[in-house]
Structures are given as structure tokens and as C-alpha cells.
């Protein structure tokens, strides 16, 4: 109550100052242009501040006051970064790294060469630190001499005050130098961090197909977060500390020899003997950290794969399979992290033991050589030892950082040296960071190539990198010794991949004439996509020549790449908005009707990978992007495979056939060879009946200034930011994951007991010096001193080990809970949160919990136990000191209350602003081919630079706020030392205790600021816990079972049907939809409206309709990927909403529209639970016509596949592999969603026969645009705008002249007419 009243008064006192500062801030000019998208808008106040303001950090006061009065900071409260610290500037310093000499230290040498000269002020500050460290013990020696003098004539008050002032000046000088050293060092670290992050992203945009196999997105995220942080931390202060701490140790040992004579050399010898042991322990700790990072990479990659493919994982009911795989990697990661911590504990134990042995050996030698332990000698030596203890602690840590730095340097250097796409080398010459890259495709490049035919002569293309590759600008040969071990590990990991899939296109000859349509046809897996990639420079050309390829190419990939942005932004793709051209493109791609049905029209956010769109809509948006780019050459890879015949005909007429420039259509549909030349009119005759429904294209273009429409258009939710202090319940929740309250209390108590024991050792030295126990020799005092220190070291080991067990248990349980919670979350969660944001919880936030929480909890406990015991000791010795200490405590409280809100909020913004960095990295990684083809690298680099600058801005001002509080509390500490030393000199009769009080005050000086900073840092890391906890508490899918003894309930408390009741379910396969309504968003229009139909046992149902009509939504509802808002879905008479999800999904077979291959072998992809024999697996492989392809691979079923199977199979073959796994299992109900859309006509007919033979007793729902795929079904369901408009046999529907199905039949192209007739 008193504290709240006091704080209210303080706020009133400061309110006028805040208003004045706020008015000044509002009048400050903007540092960003008016059209800038940067969230910062005010220039950095440090740039225009006075020298005194820079030294005292007064320029940060405005930000401090904002945070205090608002209790929260918004992004527009944070100032802009100084221009010199922006990544646009710092990244240039890494532009010319020379890897050609094969040096394993090339990166680190380059950083030293380019970044160290900027850090001269840090070096100067470090020199002053060393000088003041030397002066403070000398000043203390004179002061203790004064205190121990019994002659009143020599003990004038003025002399005492002067000596106290000199001591405080030396301490204050050291403190100011230390803070400036940290600040200048941080700026250097900051620049290194920004530059490396930028370079890693730039390199990601250049990765070749071979490099992508090695560097999955999860591994790159780990490199960008963990490894970059390791290097930047080293270039904060550690690189200078190695020299300065060594120098400080030598100076202090020299000073020790000055105080105690040659006895100091004995202590020096003990230290020299012990230092190699500490170094060895640091090295072992570093090795275990490197091992843990390898498993962390693997865990993050698997987690990334799970998150980005969460829908197929859920549909196949494979969540537990991947959870177990991730947990296994996590177990190994924690194992090596714990071993690292054990050696860290031993290291700290050795440091404490070493410091004590140095002190005891020095004092023992000094005493045994006939010298008397006087006050000035004892306590001056104690102060020297106290000052010596820090460099003794930090020098092994500096060495550890230097040793631990090399694995991170190696990982980043190898990544930056990895092979690049040939296309990226071509594009890199034209990258311009000073514009938005809006015109690179709009204006035709007047290159001679644009008017020529594309000619490919005698070319051989290959996916894998040639053995002697001379296609790169730098030499790939590396230091053999450095890379030998890594190459062996890489071979073990990738031998199955690299040896098996050396796919080549041999002796290719092709002419693509300007102004004509060229079609590339072939059976599945014949190399069509490889040829297209050869044209655009994405695979290696071993021989031959390619000429006439224009600079501007529009490209649509077989699996469309879409940004997590609005539909309009996906079409514009960085180009300027031309409304007339935009309208024309929308009409040409038949998107008008689709856009009208979207909540925010063309400004609707379509989500990562177009998650809320149908396959046909995604393809048409990709096609619209190609047309809008207005390029010289258009390359379409299967642009019609996911659209219905009517739309396909429209697209062919208005998009593909109507282009005036070079255009290439890659398809498996036209049964002609490349060698056969004929006009496109002869290949495809369009007999399309245009739908009568006409929609004005003007009605689909949104007004960006309409707030209601913008709100409706949003899909992604804003990331939550915790505000205010971290409450006690948060800490309680954190510790509940790993320990009981009793264990925690005992562990924390050990810190206070340990510090009390250590303080007893100081009292014992005072007793020893005063010879308070008569008749006892020095060996008596030495023996008991060693006993006290032995108890302290034992307590240190016990408390640190106990705390490490607690934190590691918490980290393990927290990650497990996070993984399960996210995996079992509803699909809506993944629709509204980008994968980069989710992965941030598993990388950066998890790393904070694993690595930093132990250190922080230990440091906070040490700090406050030391402050508590130390202050009690001082007050016990000098009771009068409580008066100035109370006043100092009040000031201390005010400062920490001013400081904590801003520091806490800035650190929270740091975590939040890191998510867009990871999200953009993930997004660009998935769309490298499209980004490079459209030459959009510079646009995404600029966006990434902006994201990095925003994140670095939060770090920059967070650190400035830390220095602000440190500077002020260090001054307070000096004042405390002054009053304590003055009171000891004037008011204490016991000279030994007086000297002890002064040395205690000196030791507490740094703890005042350190304690507050550690508390705020702990609050920040608890923010990582809160972010993880918020994901643990997200709503789960229904019917995820929670064990409650013998009974089972689902996560929403509803009773479910147990698996025991559904042992043979479904045994008939009867499916019934009753008035089903489905909504993807709560307030949106239904995607399925009042849908009712019934499928009898073993019936074959074909589901057709215009692209985006709701066909795939039917599939999603059957698997409960989205729950019914109205109505029921029954299978064999049982309401599926009451069936456990695991049981439901594992009981229905699925061949998804987008083929799903996960990281593993061919065998594990077909039979993930190892349920079937080799014979059964090969039998199913033969049925889907993949036997020859897999048999040609040396390792056959054990062939390793990467995520999405990009290293082994074509898109069509991946579809066949998915069909294979479905045939293998005996499902009663099977759903096929465009199962053969990317397979050539001949193979599709063979697969159709296989399906008829193997699924004859199954109930099948087949979604297809190829009408010949479903023409033999028992019934056809025609879906339009989410409604069932026709449901009858094919023959009956065909006999109705105006039926929708009949119209679809008529619009089918000639390749299907033969079958239909």
C-alpha cells in the first residue's frame, strides 16, 4: 500500500517532465520518407546529442519516460536506427569475402578486417578500465592504512574524506569506462549481426537445387538465429576481453606482488596450473554445444516439415509419428546440452576453487615466511583477489566463446560457400536496392534475344552439381583437413540421395519460335519439368548451347507459389498497379467470380501457400501473375491440371493461345511428341459454351481506403504482445513444468546459504588478521578458512546442479507440451499464423528457455543473495549506515521503476519483430524458383532489410536503456562505497570489521545494476515462456483424447465414442451428408450450403464442378479438417463429430490434391508404421506403375527422400506414390482429390484400371476435372457455389440437355472426347 502511494507521488512529480519531453519528441523531424513502410519515424536522438548526453546516456531518457508513463511501448514510440548501423550499410562490409583460397578462417578474418576498425572507442574504453582497476586497490590500501592507524594526529577527518573520494573516483572511472566499453562493443556486435543475417538471406535466394537438399529452411533458420547470435556476441566484447582480461590478470598479480611481496608469485603459479584445466573444460563444453546444435537443426527441420505440411499429416493421422521423430531428436539435443552444462558447472567450481587457492597459497606463504597479516595487506589483497576473480571467471569464458565460435563460423561459412543457381548469378548483376523493383518486368528489355527464337542445341541437363564444376565464380575447393570430417558426415546423410538421383536430359534439341505456342509433352517422369528448368537456368547444363532466352520471363510452376499477402499483391508481384491491365488479367484468368465471393474482394489475404484457396484458384492466380508481368516469354508448367474443362478452355483461349510472344506450355495432356510440329489450333479445338452469368470486373477491385473491407480481407492474426510486469503466476506456471515448490525453495535457499558461508570466510579473514583467537597458529586459521571455502564450493555445485536439473526438466516438458499443442491445433490456427512465426517458438524461444534460463536464474539468485547478505553485514558492522542506505534504496527503487517498463517492452518487441524475419525467409525459400524467374530478389531483399532493421532497432534501444540504468546505479554504488568507507573510517572502533565493511561495499557496487539488468533480462526470457505458453493454450481440434483414468473425454469436454465401440468401423462405407453447412471463418459466407446426399456401400461417386466450387471442402469436412457449422455427416450411421479424430482419419483413405512426401525412405513414405512386408509393398508399387522407376534406384525401397520428394520423383510420380500407400491399406472408404491430375493420359488409364480392380469393394469419392476419370462412376455430384445442384448417374445427367454436367462434357477438349463417346 505504501509503495503504491509512494509511486503515485513519484509519477505526479515526473509528469511535467514527461509532457515536456513528449512535446519535444512530437516536434522532432521524421527520419524516414513519407512513403516509407518502416515502422520507425523519428531520427535517433543520439546523433544530435551532446558529448555529456552520450556519456551519461541522457539521450535515452525520453524513451524511458514514455515507457514508464504508458506502461507499454508501441512501434511508433521507437526511434529510427542510425544510418551507419542499418543493414543496407553494414552488409556491404561482407560483400567481398574471398573463399577461393580455401581458408577455414576466411569469414572470421574478413569480419576482423572490416569491423574492428570501427570499434576504436571500445578499445580506448577498455584501456581506461584496466587503468582504473589498477588504481582502486592502491586507493583502498591507503584508506585501510588510515583506518588502522591508532595515532590521532595522523587521522584527520579531511584526509579520511579525501581518501574516500579518491577511492570513489577510481571506482566511478572504472564504471563509466565499463559502460562505454559495453556500448561501443554492442554497436560492433550489432553491425556484425545485421550484416550476417542479411548475407544469409541473400545467399538463401541464390541456393541451387543441390544446396537446397543440404540446407532445408529449418537449418537456415537455426544458422540465422543461433549461429549469428554466437558470432555477434563474440564481437560484442569477448574478442577484446581475451586480451584485456589477460592484461588485467597480469597487472593485478603484479600489484599483488607489490602488496605481499614474492608470496604473490606462488598464487600466480597456482593460477597458471589451473588455467589449462579451465580451458579444457571450456573446450569440452563447446564440443557438446556443437553436437547439440546438430540435433537442434534436425529437430527444427522436422518441425518445419510438420508445420508446413500439417494438413496431410492430419488427414493421414500421422501426427504422432512425426511427434515421436521430433521428440527423439529433442532427447539427443537435451542430452548434449546437459553434458555441456555439467562441464560448465565443473568450470565454475574450478574458478571458485582456483580463486580461493590463489588467495590461500598467497596468504599461507606470506605468513609462513615470517610476515604479519596486517589489515592493509589482508584487505588490499582481498580487493585484488576480488578484482582478479572477475577476469579469472571471464577469461575461460572468453576462451570458451572463442572456441565455441568456430562451429558457428564453420556452419555459416559453409553455407555462404554452397553452390548457387545459375539463374541467381545472372539476376545478381541487375539487383538494385534503391528502388522497389517495380519496373523490371513492365518495360520490355530491348535485348536482341527478345526478337529471336529460343534454340537449344545438343544440350545435356543435369540436376546434381557436376563433379568438376567450373560454373561458379569462386573456387569450390576447400581446405581438405577442415572439410574431411564434414564431408564424411554429409556423405553418410546424403549418399542415398546424391548417388541415386543423377537425373539427366541427354542430347536435347528444340526450337521455340517467337509468337507461337510450343508444347512440351511426355509421360509422367519423362523430364518435362527438367527441360523447363533448363530453359530458365535452374539446372546444370553440361554441354551444348542455349540461345535466344529473353531477359524477362513469366513462369507458372506446377505447384503454384503464393505469398502470404493479398490476392492483388500476389498478382502484381512487385510491379506497379495498372488498373486497366489488372482488369484485363482478372477477366482473362476467369477470376472475376472467385474474387466476388471473397470477403475482402481482391484485397483478401490468401494465406501462406494459398491455404484458403482451391487448387484451381491458386493456379489461376499464378497464371494472372504471369500475364500481368507482361514478359517477353511465358512458360507454363501444367497450368490447367487443377481447373475444370470449361475454365481450362477459357484459359487456353484467353491466356495461353492469345499471347503474342514466345510461350511454352508444358503438359502431359496432348498426345503428341515434341518433334511433331503443328499449330495449336490443330491440337486443341475449343467448343466452349460461355456461362451466362456475367460479373462486372470493376466489382472485384477493392478500395484500399475502405476500413470495413480491409478488416474483412485480413486472414493473419496480429501476434500477441504481453504487456506490463511478469506476474508471479507466470513464474509459478513456468516452474510447475519441472519441479515442486519444496525443491525450488531448497534450491534457492542454497544460494543464500552459500553466500552466507562465503561471507563467513571474509569474517574469518578479519579474525585471522586481528588474531582474535589467542594462541592459535596460522595453520589453524588456514585450515578453517579452507574448510569454509570447501563448504561453499560444495554448496555451489549442489545448487547449480539442482537448478540445472530443474531448468532442463522444464525445457523438456515445455517443448513436448508445445509440440503436441501446436500439432493438435485446428487448421484455422495454421491459416492465421505464418509458419515462420510458429517456428520462432520452436527455435528462438525454445533456445532462450534451454540455454539462457539457467544462467539468468543462477545469476539473479547469486546477485540478490550477495546483496542481501552483504548489506546485512555492512549494517551489522556500521549500524549508522542504514540512514544513507535507506535514501539510496529509495532512489534505487525510483530508477528501477523508471527503467523496467521500457526495457521489458523493447525486449518483447524484439521477439515479436523477429517473427517476420523468419516468416519471410520461410516464404522465400519455398518460392525460390518463381522469385528468381521474375527477378524479384531485390524486392524481397529490401523487404528483409526493413524487417531486420526493425528488429535491430528494438535491440539497439533495449541495450541503450540497459546502459542508462547501469550508469546511474553504478554512480549510486559509488555513493554507497563513499558513505560506507567514510562511516568505517570515522565511526567504527574495530579496525578489522571496518576494513571488511569497505571491501564488502566495493564488492556490492556492481551487483546493484547487475541485479536490475538480470531481473529485466529474466522478465524478457519469461516473455519467451509466455509466448510458448500462449501456444500451449491455443484451442485444440475436437476429440483429442485426454487420459482421465478409465473414462475418456475430448478436449472440449464432450463425450466421444471410444475406439472399442468402433473396432470394425466403418464396415459398410455408407456416407450421408445431412444439411451440412461449412464455414472457414466464423463471420464469412458458407463454403458449403445445405448440402445433402447419401452414398451407398461400395458406390463410386464422382464429384465435379467449377474450380473453387467447394469440392475439396467436401473432402475436408469428411476428415473434419473443418467442422460443420450446421448439419451432420454420418458414416455407417454414426455421427463423425463424435468419433475420435485419430480413429476417424485413420479409417479413411486419401490421395490428396497436392502429393505429400516427407523426409524419410521410400519404404517409410509408403508404410510409415512398418506394418507390411516387402512383397506387399512391391505389389502395390507395381500396381501404380512405379516399379521400374524405383527398381532403377540402387537402394530401391531404402532410397532416401527429402521433404516433398523433390530429389527423387516428378510431380506425377509423387501422386502415384500417394496412391500406392492408399492401395496398400484396406480402407473401406477412399477419397481421391485430383489423384491423377499430373499424370499423362496413357498412365492415367492404367491407374484407373488399377483403382477399379483394387477399390471395387470400397466406397470411393473421386474429385476430378478430367471427366473421363469419373465417367464410369455410379453417380455424379455436380457442385456449384457450395451447393449440390445435380446428383445422378452419368447417363441420366448426359441425357438432360441443359444439365450442368452436360455443359462440362461439351467443354471438354478432344483428348477426352473419344472416351466420353
From Swiss-Prot:
Start-end of Low complexity biased regions: 427-449
InterPro entries found in the cross-reference section: AAA+_ATPase, ABC1_TM_dom, ABC1_TM_sf, ABC_transporter-like_ATP-bd, ABC_transporter-like_CS, ABC_transporter_C-like, ABCC_6TM_D1, ABCC_6TM_D2
Residues holding ATP: 522-529, 1105-1112
Start and end residues of each ABC transporter domain: 490-710, 1071-1306
Keyword annotations: ATP-binding, Membrane, Nucleotide-binding, Repeat, Transmembrane, Transmembrane helix, Transport
Annotated membrane topology: Multi-pass membrane protein
Ranges where the record places region Disordered: 426-451
Subcellular location: Membrane
Family indicated by similarity: Belongs to the ABC transporter superfamily. ABCC family. Conjugate transporter (TC 3.A.1.208) subfamily.
Protein's name in the database: ABC transporter C family member 14
Organism: Dictyostelium discoideum (Social amoeba)
Amino acid at each position: 500500500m505504501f509503495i503504491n502511494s509512494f509511486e503515485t507521488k513519484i509519477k505526479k512529480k515526473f509528469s511535467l517532465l514527461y509532457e515536456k519531453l513528449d512535446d519535444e519528441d512530437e516536434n522532432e523531424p521524421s527520419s524516414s520518407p513519407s512513403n516509407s513502410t518502416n515502422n520507425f519515424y523519428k531520427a535517433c536522438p543520439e546523433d544530435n546529442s551532446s558529448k555529456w548526453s552520450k556519456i551519461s546516456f541522457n539521450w535515452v531518457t525520453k524513451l524511458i519516460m514514455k515507457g514508464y508513463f504508458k506502461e507499454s511501448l508501441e512501434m511508433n514510440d521507437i526511434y529510427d536506427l542510425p544510418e551507419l548501423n542499418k543493414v543496407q550499410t553494414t552488409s556491404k562490409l561482407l560483400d567481398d569475402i574471398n573463399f577461393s583460397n580455401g581458408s577455414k578462417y576466411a569469414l572470421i578474418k574478413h569480419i576482423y578486417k572490416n569491423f574492428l576498425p570501427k570499434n576504436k572507442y571500445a578499445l580506448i574504453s577498455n584501456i581506461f578500465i584496466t587503468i582504473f582497476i589498477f588504481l582502486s586497490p592502491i586507493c583502498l590500501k591507503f584508506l585501510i592504512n588510515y583506518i588502522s592507524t591508532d595515532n590521532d594526529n595522523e587521522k584527520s577527518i579531511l584526509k579520511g574524506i579525501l581518501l574516500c573520494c579518491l577511492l570513489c573516483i577510481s571506482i566511478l572511472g572504472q564504471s563509466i569506462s565499463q559502460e562505454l566499453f559495453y556500448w561501443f562493443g554492442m554497436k560492433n556486435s550489432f553491425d556484425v549481426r545485421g550484416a550476417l543475417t542479411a548475407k544469409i538471406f541473400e545467399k538463401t535466394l541464390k541456393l541451387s537445387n543441390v544446396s537446397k537438399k543440404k540446407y532445408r529452411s529449418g537449418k537456415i533458420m537455426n544458422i540465422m538465429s543461433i549461429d549469428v547470435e554466437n558470432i555477434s556476441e563474440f564481437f560484442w566484447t569477448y574478442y577484446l576481453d581475451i586480451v584485456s582480461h589477460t592484461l588485467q590478470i597480469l597487472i593485478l598479480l603484479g600489484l599483488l606482488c607489490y602488496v605481499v611481496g614474492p608470496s604473490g608469485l606462488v598464487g600466480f603459479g597456482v593460477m597458471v596450473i589451473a588455467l589449462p584445466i579451465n580451458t579444457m573444460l571450456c573446450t569440452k563444453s563447446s564440443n557438446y554445444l556443437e553436437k547439440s546444435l546438430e540435433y537442434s537443426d534436425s529437430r527444427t527441420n522436422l518441425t518445419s516439415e510438420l508445420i508446413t505440411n500439417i494438413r496431410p499429416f492430419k488427414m493421414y493421422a500421422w501426427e504422432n509419428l512425426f511427434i515421436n521423430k521430433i521428440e527423439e531428436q529433442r532427447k539427443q539435443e537435451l542430452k548434449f546440452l546437459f553434458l555441456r552444462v555439467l562441464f560448465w558447472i565443473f568450470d565454475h567450481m574450478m574458478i571458485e576453487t582456483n580463486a580461493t587457492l590463489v588467495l590461500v597459497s598467497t596468504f599461507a606463504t606470506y605468513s609462513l615466511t615470517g610476515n604479519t597479516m596486517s589489515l592493509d595487506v589482508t584487505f588490499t589483497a582481498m580487493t585484488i583477489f576480488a578484482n582478479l576473480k572477475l577476469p579469472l571467471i571471464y577469461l575461460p569464458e572468453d576462451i570458451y566463446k572463442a572456441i565455441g565460435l568456430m562451429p558457428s563460423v564453420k556452419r555459416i561459412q559453409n553455407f555462404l560457400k554452397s553452390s548457387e543457381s545459375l539463374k541467381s548469378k545472372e539476376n545478381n548483376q541487375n539487383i538494385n536496392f534503391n528502388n522497389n523493383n517495380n519496373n523490371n518486368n513492365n518495360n520490355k528489355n530491348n535485348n536482341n534475344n527478345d526478337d529471336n527464337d529460343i534454340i537449344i542445341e545438343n544440350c545435356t541437363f543435369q540436376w546434381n552439381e557436376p563433379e568438376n564444376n567450373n560454373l561458379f565464380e569462386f573456387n569450390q575447393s576447400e581446405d581438405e583437413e577442415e572439410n574431411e570430417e564434414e564431408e564424411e558426415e554429409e556423405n553418410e546423410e546424403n549418399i542415398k540421395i546424391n548417388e541415386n538421383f543423377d537425373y539427366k536430359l541427354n542430347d536435347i534439341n528444340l526450337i521455340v519460335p517467337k509468337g507461337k505456342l510450343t508444347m512440351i509433352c511426355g509421360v509422367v517422369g519423362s523430364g518435362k519439368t527438367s527441360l523447363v528448368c533448363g530453359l530458365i537456368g535452374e539446372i546444370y547444363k553440361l554441354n551444348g548451347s542455349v540461345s535466344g532466352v529473353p531477359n524477362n520471363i513469366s513462369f507458372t510452376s506446377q505447384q503454384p507459389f503464393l505469398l502470404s499477402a493479398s490476392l492483388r499483391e500476389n498478382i502484381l508481384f512487385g510491379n506497379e498497379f495498372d488498373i486497366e491491365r489488372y482488369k484485363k488479367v482478372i477477366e482473362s484468368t476467369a477470376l472475376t467470380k472467385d474474387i466476388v465471393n471473397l470477403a475482402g474482394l481482391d484485397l483478401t489475404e490468401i494465406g501462406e501457400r494459398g491455404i484458403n484457396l482451391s487448387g484451381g484458384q491458386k493456379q489461376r492466380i499464378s497464371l494472372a501473375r504471369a500475364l500481368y508481368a507482361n514478359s517477353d516469354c511465358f512458360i507454363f508448367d501444367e497450368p490447367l491440371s487443377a481447373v475444370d474443362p470449361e475454365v481450362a478452355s477459357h484459359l487456353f483461349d484467353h491466356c495461353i493461345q492469345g499471347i503474342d510472344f514466345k510461350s511454352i506450355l508444358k503438359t502431359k495432356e496432348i498426345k503428341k511428341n515434341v518433334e511433331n510440329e503443328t499449330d495449336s489450333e490443330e491440337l486443341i479445338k475449343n467448343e466452349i459454351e460461355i456461362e451466362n452469368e456475367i460479373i462486372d470486373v470493376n466489382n472485384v477491385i477493392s478500395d484500399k481506403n475502405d476500413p470495413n473491407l480491409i478488416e474483412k480481407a485480413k486472414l493473419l492474426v496480429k501476434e500477441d504482445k504481453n504487456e506490463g510486469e511478469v506476474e508471479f503466476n507466470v513464474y509459478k506456471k513456468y516452474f510447475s513444468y519441472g519441479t515442486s515448490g519444496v525443491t525450488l525453495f531448497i534450491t534457492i535457499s542454497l544460494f543464500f546459504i552459500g553466500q552466507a558461508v562465503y561471507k563467513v570466510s571474509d569474517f574469518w579473514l578479519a579474525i585471522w588478521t586481528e588474531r582474535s583467537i589467542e594462541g592459535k597458529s596460522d595453520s589453524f586459521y588456514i585450515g578453517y578458512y579452507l574448510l569454509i571455502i570447501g563448504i561453499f564450493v560444495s554448496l555451489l555445485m549442489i545448487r547449480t546442479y539442482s537448478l540445472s536439473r530443474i531448468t532442463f526438466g522444464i525445457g523438456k516438458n515445455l517443448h513436448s507440451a508445445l509440440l503436441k499443442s501446436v500439432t493438435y491445433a485446428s487448421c484455422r490456427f495454421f491459416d492465421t499464423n505464418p509458419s515462420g512465426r510458429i517456428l520462432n517458438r520452436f527455435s528462438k524461444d525454445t533456445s532462450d528457455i534451454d540455454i539462457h534460463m539457467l544462467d539468468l536464474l543462477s545469476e539473479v539468485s547469486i546477485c540478490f543473495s550477495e546483496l542481501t547478505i552483504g548489506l546485512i553485514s555492512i549494517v551489522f558492522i556500521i549500524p549508522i549506515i542504514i540512514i544513507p542506505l535507506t535514501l539510496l534504496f529509495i532512489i534505487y527503487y525510483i530508477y528501477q521503476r523508471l527503467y523496467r517498463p521500457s526495457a521489458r517492452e523493447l525486449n518483447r518487441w524484439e521477439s515479436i519483430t523477429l517473427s517476420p524475419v523468419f516468416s519471410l525467409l520461410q516464404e522465400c525459400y519455398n518460392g525460390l524458383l518463381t522469385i528468381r524467374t521474375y527477378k524479384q530478389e531485390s524486392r524481397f531483399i529490401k523487404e528483409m532489410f526493413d524487417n531486420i532493421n526493425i528488429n535491430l532497432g528494438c535491440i539497439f534501444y533495449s541495450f541503450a536503456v540497459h546502459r542508462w540504468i547501469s550508469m546511474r546505479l553504478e554512480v549510486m554504488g559509488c555513493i554507497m562505497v563513499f558513505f560506507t568507507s567514510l562511516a568505517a573510517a570515522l565511526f567504527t572502533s574495530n579496525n578489522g570489521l571496518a576494513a571488511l565493511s569497505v571491501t564488502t561495499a566495493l564488492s556490492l557496487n556492481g551487483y546493484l545494476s547487475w541485479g536490475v539488468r538480470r531481473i529485466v533480462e529474466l522478465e524478457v526470457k519469461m516473455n519467451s515462456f509466455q509466448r510458448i505458453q500462449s501456444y500451449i493454450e491455443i484451442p485444440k481440434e475436437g476429440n483429442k483424447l485426454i487420459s482421465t483414468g478409465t473414462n475418456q473425454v475430448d478436449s472440449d469436454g464432450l463425450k466421444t465414442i471410444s475406439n472399442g465401440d468402433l473396432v470394425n468401423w466403418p464396415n459398410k462405407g455408407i456416407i450421408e451428408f445431412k444439411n451440412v453447412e461449412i464455414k472457414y471463418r466464423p463471420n464469412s459466407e458458407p463454403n458449403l450450403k445445405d448440402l445433402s446426399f447419401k452414398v451407398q456401400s461400395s458406390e463410386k461417386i464422382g464429384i465435379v464442378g467449377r474450380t473453387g466450387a467447394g469440392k475439396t471442402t467436401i473432402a475436408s469436412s469428411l476428415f473434419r479438417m473443418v467442422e460443420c457449422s450446421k448439419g451432420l455427416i454420418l458414416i455407417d450411421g454414426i455421427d463423425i463429430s463424435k468419433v475420435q479424430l485419430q480413429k476417424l482419419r485413420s479409417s479413411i483413405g486419401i490421395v490428396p490434391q497436392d502429393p505429400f512426401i516427407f523426409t524419410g525412405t521410400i519404404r517409410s513414405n509408403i508404410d510409415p508404421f512398418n506394418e507390411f512386408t516387402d512383397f506387399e509393398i512391391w505389389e502395390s508399387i507395381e500396381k501404380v506403375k512405379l516399379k521400374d522407376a524405383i527398381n532403377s534406384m540402387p537402394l530401391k525401397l531404402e532410397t532416401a527422400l527429402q521433404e516433398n520428394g523433390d530429389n527423387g520423383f516428378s510431380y506425377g510420380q509423387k501422386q502415384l506414390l500417394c496412391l500406392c500407400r492408399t492401395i496398400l491399406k484396406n480402407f473401406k472408404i477412399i477419397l481421391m482429390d485430383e489423384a491423377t491430375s499430373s499424370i499423362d493420359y496413357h498412365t492415367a488409364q492404367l491407374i484407373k484400371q488399377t483403382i477399379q480392380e483394387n477399390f471395387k469393394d470400397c466406397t470411393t469419392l473421386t474429385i476430378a476435372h478430367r471427366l473421363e476419370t469419373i465417367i464410369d462412376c455410379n453417380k455424379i455430384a455436380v457442385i456449384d457455389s457450395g451447393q449440390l445442384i445435380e446428383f445422378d448417374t452419368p447417363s441420366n445427367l448426359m441425357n438432360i440437355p441443359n444439365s450442368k454436367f452436360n455443359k462440362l462434357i461439351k467443354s471438354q477438349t478432344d483428348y477426352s472426347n473419344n472416351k466420353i463417346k
